[in-house]
A protein has these predicted regions:
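Conserved N-terminal structural module of periplasmic/extracytoplasmic solute-binding proteins
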Residues: 2-107, 290-292, 314, 318, ...
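Extracytoplasmic "Venus flytrap"/periplasmic binding protein-like
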Residues: 66-131, 163-166, 264-265, 275-276, ...
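Short helix-initiation/N-cap motifs at beta->coil->alpha
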Residues: 77-86, 105, 173-179, 245-259
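Hinge/lid segment of periplasmic solute-binding proteins
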Residues: 103-152, 179, 206, 286, ...
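Periplasmic solute-binding protein
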Residues: 110-115, 133-170, 198-218, 300-308, ...
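Extracytoplasmic/periplasmic substrate-recognition and gating elements
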Residues: 165, 238-242, 277-339
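Glycine-centered hinge/linker elements that transmit conformational signals in sensory
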Residues: 182-186, 219-247
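Long, aromatic- and glycine/proline-rich binding clefts that accommodate carbohydrate-like moieties
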Residues: 337-387
Length: 414
């Protein structure tokens, strides 16, 4: 590996730390599992699912794909934030995994560091993948993997709270009607909405649906549309529709507030579905509305299945077989159900909704979703995101107006 490539990898290690800060996966020690197959050698797969131990459906799927390809699989599972750095260090040592399943925002960082091969290189078929989801794995006009599934944000609502306030959820179609619903809820003695505005990537993740829903672009943090989005959040705090605790809320603590039964709405993700079923009250889900109606684009979460660069190019053909097996329609349905993900293809999404009608609003939200590193932002995104969450913190705490906070953010990005 030449010196310029090593410099790119070293810089990428620093970038990855910022991008993976919003990871919500469970932490765990690495878990190695392997399965035997006739001949063909051993192929390594790294994934961010330490919660799935040896003997789990996920581990069995990996084993099965290895058997189908005629090779032995050695699997290592890491916490999401650890995995990206491990992948970069392995690349520096020319010891990359054969297949790497990684959080979608860091794909562009790994790609620009020269760690990943393109789908064109390895003839991976991504033709059925929804373009908005595939975009999260694209950089410089090239695609560096295929999504295994996606999660995103939407609005959970408490049916009893809205009924008591006389709010028909079908009337909530834009920011004006959503705010009006919160006013009725407050008048009825309950609370409007909870979300996470914490000063980390998690806060940016939660702000993005409102930012994009205003028509704003990440290259113009100080646009009038962006100011309107931050002003909306500030108004909710000033009116008492949202609690001051949102400034420090993570998505977990925000959910705990909603689970108390006192709130009409909560912005949260598909990963809370199991908790929603245990909340003890009837709930519903709607996509985050755009400023003037329609569904706002929410940021996509979820992982990409990628093939890292290898010194032995003869390994790519088998790696391609493994990735194709992991992401075929039959296996995607099982895997995405296990992960509480929405599938990346319309074909499998339809099957998910047919099996569970409650997934429909999530499928709709994913169809409107957008990758944080899309629009060729790539490694520029972490710096933009940091200035965004700082602006949100500044405005909501009252230390600066939304306009001034975003103006400072844009100046810092340039």
């Amino acid at each position: 590996m030449n010196r310029s490539a090593r410099r790119r990898l070293t810089a990428a290690v620093l970038t990855v730390v910022a991008v993976t800060a919003s990871a919500t996966a469970c932490s765990s020690d690495a878990d190695d599992t392997s399965t035997k197959a006739e001949g063909g050698g051993t192929y390594t797969i790294w994934d961010p699912y330490p919660q799935f131990e040896k003997g789990s459906a996920w581990a069995k799927l990996l084993d099965g794909c290895g058997t189908e390809a005629g090779v032995k699989i050695k699997r290592t599972a890491f916490d999401t934030s650890d995995l990206a750095n491990k992948a970069l260090l392995a690349a520096q040592q020319d010891n990359s995994a054969d297949v790497l399943i990684v959080d979608n925002p860091v794909v562009s960082t790994l790609a620009e560091a020269g760690v990943l091969t393109t789908t064109e290189d390895n003839k991976l078929d991504t033709s059925k993948v929804s373009p908005n989801l595939l975009a999260a794995g694209q950089s410089g006009g090239k695609t560096y993997g295929t999504p295994i599934g996606a999660n995103t944000l939407a609005l959970y609502y408490n049916k009893a709270v809205l009924k008591k306030a006389g709010v028909d959820i079908s009337s909530v179609t834009d920011w004006k009607s959503l705010t009006a619903a919160m006013a009725k809820v407050k008048k009825a003695g309950k609370k409007g909405i909870t979300f996470s505005a914490i000063g980390t990537e998690e806060g940016s993740f939660q702000f993005l649906p409102w930012f994009w829903g205003s028509g704003a672009k990440l290259t113009e943090l100080d646009s009038s549309q962006a100011v309107s989005a931050l002003s909306l959040w500030k108004k909710w705090l000033d009116k008492g529709y949202a609690p001051n605790s949102v400034i420090n809320n993570t998505q977990t603590t925000s959910w705990q507030e909603f689970a108390s039964g006192d709130y009409a709405f909560a912005e949260n993700g598909t990963w809370q579905l199991a908790n929603a079923e245990k909340a003890g009250f009837e709930y519903g889900v709607i996509p985050v509305p755009g400023a003037s109606g329609g569904d706002a684009a929410a940021p996509t979460g979820g992982e990409f299945v990628t093939i890292p660069v290898q010194g032995d190019t003869g390994r790519y053909a088998t790696s391609q077989k493994l990735v194709s097996c992991l992401t075929n329609s039959e296996n995607l349905l099982e895997t995405d159900t296990t992960l509480s993900y929405v599938a990346p293809t319309t074909e499998v999404q339809d099957k998910q909704v047919a099996a569970d009608a409650k997934l429909k609003p999530w499928v709709d939200a994913v169809k409107a979703a957008k990758g944080r590193t899309s629009d060729d932002l790539g490694t520029k995104y972490p710096k933009i995101s940091e200035q965004m969450w700082k602006a949100v913190q500044s405005a909501l705490s009252g230390s600066a107006s939304p306009k001034d906070a975003l103006g400072s953010a844009q100046s810092a990005v340039k």
